[in-house]
Swiss-Prot record:
SMART domains: AAA. Belongs to the archaeal ATPase family. This is Uncharacterized ATP-binding protein MJ0074. It comes from Methanocaldococcus jannaschii (strain ATCC 43067 / DSM 2661 / JAL-1 / JCM 10045 / NBRC 100440) (Methanococcus jannaschii). ATP binds at residues 29-36.
Amino acid sequence: MKFFDREKEIAEILHILNREPDDVYFIYGPINSGKTALINEIINNRLDKDKYVVFYFDLREIFISKYDDFIEVLFEEYEGNKKPVEIIKSLIKDVPSLCGIPAPKNTLEEILKKKTTKNVFRYITKVLMDIKKEGKQPILIIDELQKIGDMKINGFLIYELFNYFVSLTKHKHLCHVFCLSSDSLFIERVYNEAMLDGRAKYLLVDDFDKETALKFMDFLAKENNISLTNEDKELIYNYVGGKPKDIKYVVEESNFKDLKEVLDYLLNDEISKLDMFLEILDYSKPRVEVGNEVIEINKEDIIKALRLFKDKYEIPKKDIPTPVYVYLVKENILFLNPQKRILKPQSYLVWNAIKRLL
């Protein structure tokens, strides 16, 4: 399928890339809002391949629990006497981005043996500087960064990474750094992190607004040779809102199924999930960590919080006690925008399930 819209976000990211690196950028948004698709569109179709070298690390693809896993994500081993920059130059002729930084076998063995991030970062910096000397601008993109949020290597790895990213951008102006995440609690933690104050920027990739969602339906209908009336499009939006993945599923399924049947199937599925979530709370009391305290959550407090969404899609964060919204965000029922300090359901389907069930 052709890429649709996001021209505003694309223009902003290209504008950032045309400047000297100076900030770490965090790209966040609800689940399935199109963050990865946006970045892939930029990497594959919008960048001058003669000007940029992109390293794209997708952490969702690898289970990371120890130092060796982290190294496996970052590096691609090779044998021979070629310099890493020569390997990179030969690779980027054929692919738009690299999924690891080339490292000679003996160098990689040494990095694995010493088990310190200092050696890792020193090697990466050397490679990035060599790329810069070749007249190209390196870009690091880390997708689902929160996967290493609690991992420790001589202290929390994430803080060492933040310091390193700040060094690459704010201090050395060497490399653009973009971190993607759909974990809004992680983004809230990052947003309030003192070491990143004045050194990081945040880009929200949200679900489509109504106008764009309706245009997306027209686009998909044309792509799939489907006829959608205005009433059909309004019905789709009322059920799934502007969630690109949900809209795509509904339009494509409606090619050979009744539209209302497809929509009711999705909604009933979401209602069943929410019902089960609430039923489990009759038998267990979840706990969440807030600061240095572990707080127990009551079912009554969760229901009270969810009922606030009966008549509103968005509410101020302060309207729900912190432990309760933390739990609901962890369970992917709510999404938190830390910049605007608002909470909303992860999707229109979740919102409709809340309204039907409560």
